[in-house]
C-alpha cells in the first residue's frame, strides 16, 4: 500500500529555539517500509499545508497516518485528517504518537467519522499489524493498541526488539532545516526508551509503564555512522541512567574516532552518580546538557515530585561547569506566581551562568497532575496546552501574568541568545554560514515576533474548535499509577537496570508507582 506519514507544524517554542527531526515517525516509517509498503514522509515543520494537499492530490495514498506527540497539535491533525478523507474518501486515516495515546476517544469524536482509528503505544509495533489487517480486510478492532469508533483492541505491546529498525532518515527532503540552538544542522538519535521515575507533571513514565529499555551499542554505532550532521541530539528522557551502557557507547565512539557535538538531557542526581560517564562524553564532544531542575526551592520540588534536593541540583551544576559544558535548565512557572516571585526568579537566573528556560505549569492527559488539577482548568482548548500558555487560574490578572512571563523570558533570552551573546559566537555563526546553514542565525531575531503577551492573550480569545474532555472526578486523592499507563507495567523485568541502579532510582522517586 501507498502510505503517507505526516508530522504536524511547529509549536510556539520550536518556532525560535529548535527544530528537531521527527525521529519517532521515521522509525514507524521504516517499520512499514520493511513490511513492504511504499512510504512517503512529510514534516510540516519545514513544509506547508499546500505541499500536503499537493501530495494527496498527485500521489493519492491508500493510507494517511499522522504523528501526534504534542497536545497543541490536536486541532491541526484533526483538520488534516478530515481534509485527507474528504479529498480521498477511500483512503484510511489514523493517528498515533505520544499524546494521541492519551486522548484517543477525543480524537475520534472530533474526527466525526473521517478519522478511522487511533493507534496507541509504540508505532513500530502497532502500525505494521494495523496495515496487515487492513490488507486482508480483517477486523482492525483486534489489533493491539487500536481504538476506533466501533471498538477497541487489546492493550498495545512493546516493540519486540529496539535494535530491529533504524530511522528512515532518507525519506526527509530537508534535513538541513533541523537544528538545536547553535547545533546547526542537528540530527536526533535514541539510546534508550522510557523513564523509571514518576514525576507528577510528566507522562514519559506513564506512557511506557515505568519501563526503561536500551538499544545495543552495535545498533547505536550503526545509526551514528549513517548520520552526516555535525550536531546530534540524544533524545532519551534521561541520558545514561545505567552507567555501563553510557560507557560502552562512548568507548565504541572513541575507538572509531567519530567526532560530533552532542546535546543531551539528564537529571542532576544521575550526573553526580555517573561522573566518569559524563567526563568521557565531554571528551567525545558533549557540548550541551539540559537539566530539568524545575524549581529553586524545596516547596516547588515537592510539588512536582522531583526528589532531587536543591543541594544536589546545585552540586550537579557545579560539576557540569567544571567540565566546561554549557548547561540549560528548565524552571516551571506556576500560575500562582506574583510579581515578586517573577522578580526573584529573574535575579536568580541572572546570577548563574546557565541558560534558563521558563515553561508554564500545565496538567497534561497522562500525568498525575491532570487528574488532580484538571478541574481547575480555565480553558479546554488543545492549542493552549503547549507549556507557554496558562491553562490554570493565575494569581495575577492574565495580561499581567503574561507580561511578567515574557519579561522574564526576554531577560533570559538576551542573556544567552541576543545579539550581545551572538558577538561571542561569531566563529560559530561564521562556520554555519560557510556551510550554508542559517537556522541559528535566523532564530536570533525571531523571539519578539513569537513571545509576545498580546499574541498569547489573543490565543485565548479564539473560538475553541475542539474542546478537550476532562477526566472523571477522582474518587480517591491518590491516583493509581496503573490507571495512567498506556503500556502495561511489566515490573522490574522491564527495566534494563542493574540492582544498584534500580535501588538508586527507587530512592529518587516519591512513591506513586509501584510497578
Curated annotation (Swiss-Prot):
Name this polypeptide is given: Hopanoid C-3 methylase
GO biological processes: methylation
Matching PROSITE patterns: B12_BINDING, RADICAL_SAM
Domain B12-binding stretches: 8-141
Positions bound to [4Fe-4S] cluster: 195, 199, 202
Pfam families assigned: B12-binding, Radical_SAM
Cofactor or coenzyme needed: [4Fe-4S] cluster
Keywords, sorted A to Z: Iron, Iron-sulfur, Metal-binding, Methyltransferase, S-adenosyl-L-methionine, Transferase
SUPFAM superfamilies the UniProt entry points to: Cobalamin (vitamin B12)-binding domain, Radical SAM enzymes
Observed phenotype of the null mutant: Deletion results in reduced intracytoplasmic membranes and in decreased survival in late stationary phase.
Organism (species): Methylococcus capsulatus (strain ATCC 33009 / NCIMB 11132 / Bath)
Annotated GO MF terms: cobalamin binding; iron-sulfur cluster binding; metal ion binding; methyltransferase activity
InterPro entries: Aldolase_TIM, Cobalamin-bd, Cobalamin-bd_sf, Elp3/MiaA/NifB-like_rSAM, HpnR_B12_rSAM, rSAM, Tetrapyrrole_Bchl_Biosynth_MTs
Membrane-spanning intervals of the chain: none
Annotated EC: 2.1.1.-
Domain Radical SAM core as annotated: residue spans: 181-395
Transferase as UniProt keyword: yes
Record lineage: Bacteria, Pseudomonadati, Pseudomonadota, Gammaproteobacteria, Methylococcales
Amino acid at each position: 500500500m501507498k502510505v503517507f506519514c505526516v508530522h504536524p507544524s511547529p509549536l510556539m517554542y520550536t518556532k525560535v529555539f529548535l527544530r528537531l527531526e521527527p525521529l519517532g515517525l521515521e522509525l514507524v516509517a521504516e517499520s512499514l517500509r520493511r513490511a513492504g509498503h511504499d512510504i512517503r514522509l512529510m514534516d510540516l515543520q519545514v513544509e506547508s499545508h499546500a505541499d500536503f494537499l499537493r501530495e494527496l492530490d498527485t500521489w493519492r495514498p491508500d493510507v494517511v497516518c499522522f504523528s501526534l506527540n504534542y497536545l497543541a497539535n490536536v486541532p491541526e491533525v484533526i483538520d488534516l485528517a478530515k481534509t485527507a478523507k474528504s479529498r480521498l474518501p477511500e483512503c484510511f486515516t489514523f493517528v498515533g504518537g505520544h499524546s494521541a495515546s492519551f486522548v484517543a476517544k477525543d480524537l475520534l469524536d472530533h474526527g466525526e467519522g473521517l478519522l478511522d482509528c487511533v493507534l496507541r503505544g509504540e508505532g513500530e509495533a502497532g502500525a505494521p499489524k494495523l496495515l496487515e489487517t487492513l490488507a486482508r480486510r480483517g477486523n482492525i478492532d483486534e489489533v493491539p493498541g487500536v481504538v476506533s469508533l466501533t471498538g477497541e483492541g487489546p492493550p498495545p505491546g512493546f516493540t519486540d526488539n529496539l535494535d530491529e529498525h533504524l530511522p528512515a532518515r532518507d525519506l526527509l527532503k530537508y534535513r538541513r532545516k533541523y537544528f538545536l540552538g547553535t547545533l546547526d544542522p542537528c540530527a536526533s538519535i535514541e539510546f534508550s526508551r522510557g523513564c523509571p521515575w514518576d514525576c507528577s507533571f510528566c507522562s514519559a513514565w506513564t506512557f511506557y509503564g515505568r519501563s526503561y529499555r536500551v538499544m545495543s551499542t552495535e545498533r547505536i554505532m550503526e545509526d551514528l555512522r549513517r548520520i552526516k550532521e555535525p550536531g546530534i541530539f540524544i533524545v532519551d528522557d534521561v541520558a545514561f541512567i545505567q552507567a555501563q551502557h553510557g560507557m560502552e557507547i562512548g568507548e565504541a565512539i572513541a575507538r572509531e574516532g567519530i567526532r560530533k557535538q552532542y546535546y543531551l538531557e539528564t537529571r542532576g542526581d544521575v550526573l553526580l552518580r555517573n561522573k566518569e560517564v559524563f567526563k568521557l562524553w565531554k571528551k567525545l564532544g558533549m557540548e550541551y546538557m539540559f537539566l530539568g531542575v524545575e524549581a529553586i526551592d524545596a516547596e516547588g520540588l515537592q510539588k512536582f515530585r522531583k526528589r532531587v534536593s536543591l543541594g544536589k541540583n546545585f552540586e550537579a551544576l557545579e560539576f557540569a561547569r567544571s567540565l566546561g559544558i554549557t548547561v540549560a535548565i528548565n524552571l516551571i512557572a506556576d500560575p500562582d506566581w506574583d510579581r515578586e516571585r517573577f522578580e526573584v526568579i529573574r535575579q536568580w537566573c541572572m546570577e548563574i551562568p546557565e541558560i534558563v528556560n521558563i515553561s508554564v505549569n500545565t496538567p497534561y492527559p497522562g500525568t498525575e497532575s491532570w487528574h488532580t488539577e484538571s478541574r481547575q482548568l480555565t480553558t479546554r482548548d488543545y492549542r493552549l496546552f503547549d507549556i507557554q500558555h496558562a491553562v490554570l487560574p493565575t494569581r495575577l490578572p492574565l495580561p499581567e501574568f503574561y507580561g511578567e512571563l515574557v519579561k522574564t523570558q526576554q531577560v533570559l533570552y538576551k542573556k544567552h541568545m541576543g545579539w550581545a551573546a551572538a558577538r561571542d559566537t561569531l566563529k560559530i555563526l561564521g562556520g554555519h554560514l560557510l556551510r550554508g546553514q542559517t537556522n541559528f542565525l535566523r532564530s536570533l531575531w525571531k523571539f519578539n515576533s513569537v513571545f509576545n503577551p498580546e499574541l498569547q492573550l489573543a490565543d485565548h480569545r479564539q473560538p475553541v474548535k475542539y474542546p478537550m474532555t476532562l477526566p472523571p472526578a477522582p474518587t480517591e486523592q491518590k491516583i493509581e499509577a496503573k490507571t495512567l499507563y498506556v503500556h502495561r507495567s511489566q515490573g522490574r523485568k522491564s527495566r534494563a537496570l542493574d540492582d544498584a541502579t534500580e535501588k538508586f532510582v527507587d530512592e529518587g522517586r516519591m512513591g506513586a508507582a509501584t510497578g
